[in-house]
């Protein structure tokens, strides 16, 4: 563990969706987001992680479409399902036409009332559900290494 920093922010996407205006929720409910592994914000760190894992596909771009709002299969609650690291545009819209609404949604998702900050310590263990929570590791421990082990479970396709 680094002597300082390295916390992770978690954001509740149920609340992010539920606090949008009724008109905004109606607009978003039918939209599909296009997500890319090659988005400039994440491409470099992704390539480094895959290269470090000795995978030959580090530079391969993965593109997938998901609903902007998904329904959690177990709770039935609706959650905002766009991500500043991967969502590049809305289906049938250009990146330029999508940009303003996406930037609004990305900022909305990060509102303090939706987030908590997890301070890692030796032996810490965290569980979260990517279907309704987003996480953001804070890279503020320059010159130090943070080693963690992650397990990702297979899940359902967003609906």
What feature does the model see in each segment?
Residues 1-125, 130-159:
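Non-heme Fe(II) oxygenase catalytic core, chiefly the N-lobe of the double-stranded beta-helix
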